[in-house]
Amino acid sequence: MADLKQVYHDKVVPELQAKFGYSNVMQVPRLQKIVVNMGVGEAIADKNFLNNAIGNLEAITGQKAQTTYAKKSIAGFKLREGQAVGCRVTLRRRQMWEFLDRLINAALPRVRDFRGVSEKAFDGRGNYTMGIKEQIIFPEIDYDKVDKVRGMDICIVTSAKTDDEARQLLAGFNMPFRKKEGNNG
């Protein structure tokens, strides 16, 4: 596996410069951060669920997870303001590149019935958000020690101004986008 940062500088930057006509290397879109968020609704009843989720997230990302708290009370969910409801990790620099490399080359191919990630998950400002239904697709998670299968949100923040620039940037890293299906008659 080649270092993704090196791939970015050697392959992706020249391709994007040629395609979009950037006159300066600094205009080329780049990754800024990756935010991995895990909501743990069961933490309201039992704090052990949150501790297990934090342990899983730290194993996956290699960085200490931050606990997230409820902003306001919702009686229907038996939720009080300030109660712990999840955890998140913000990855930058080396950890960001390593996580993206593991996500693309190791984790996503292990998803059941995987046909590629959606091309419609861009937010209009060059950021890409995807949801993962099972944390067990990551090789760092021991399947036998998992108490409950949880999902997570992964938000890839880029400096791209448009969705097309961000799509080309991620495609340069071999992000497996879903192929468009044509009419087979």
UniProtKB/Swiss-Prot annotation:
This protein's UniProt keywords: Ribonucleoprotein, Ribosomal protein, RNA-binding, rRNA-binding, tRNA-binding
InterPro entries: Ribosomal_uL5, Ribosomal_uL5_bac-type, Ribosomal_uL5_C, Ribosomal_uL5_dom_sf, Ribosomal_uL5_N
Biological process terms in GO annotation: translation
GO cellular component, one term: ribosome
GO MF terms, alphabetically ordered: rRNA binding; structural constituent of ribosome; tRNA binding
Superkingdom of source: Bacteria
Entry similarity comment: Belongs to the universal ribosomal protein uL5 family.
Function: This is one of the proteins that bind and probably mediate the attachment of the 5S RNA into the large ribosomal subunit, where it forms part of the central protuberance. In the 70S ribosome it contacts protein S13 of the 30S subunit (bridge B1b), connecting the 2 subunits; this bridge is implicated in subunit movement. Contacts the P site tRNA; the 5S rRNA and some of its associated proteins might help stabilize positioning of ribosome-bound tRNAs.
Complex formation: Part of the 50S ribosomal subunit; part of the 5S rRNA/L5/L18/L25 subcomplex. Contacts the 5S rRNA and the P site tRNA. Forms a bridge to the 30S subunit in the 70S ribosome.
Protein known as: Large ribosomal subunit protein uL5
Protein species of origin: Magnetococcus marinus (strain ATCC BAA-1437 / JCM 17883 / MC-1)
